[in-house]
Amino acid sequence: VTIAKVNGFCFTGALELAMACDVVVVANEAKLGDTHAKFGLRPTWGLSQRLPALVGLARARELSFTARMFSGVEAAEWGLAAVATPLADLDATVTGLIEQMAENSQESFVAYKDLYGAAESKGQAEGLAYEADTDFVFTDTAERLADFR
């Protein structure tokens, strides 16, 4: 699982890298933006696909065409970030997420990453069929169920 911890400025390629992570946690005070057009560039690391998938096509166009900055709070409100938190709490928030994740099945994470990848590349009907038909090996299920009391 990859986590982007965003503080300060996150523009252009940095924004593309953050969106490629599984979870984005951003400081409220962070400044983000797609500034490709400002500098005569084009996205090459997935922004043209990920940004509209996260925030919607209309907002993605507006952000890309204006190259305007937006806050961490806005990023979370729009779905680009999973969590926005005050800068003073950013490290603790990320650490808390890591601790929660560490308690869960790593084998489940492998399955989720594969299935979420399918969600990005297949239509819903094909993605649902893939989920139903794909087997994943879990060696910790019995132990985890026994410990669930």
How would you describe each model-predicted region?
Residues 67-73, 88, 92, 96-149:
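C-terminal alpha-helix plus adjacent terminal tail
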Residues 2-107:
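Crotonase-fold acyl-CoA enzyme core
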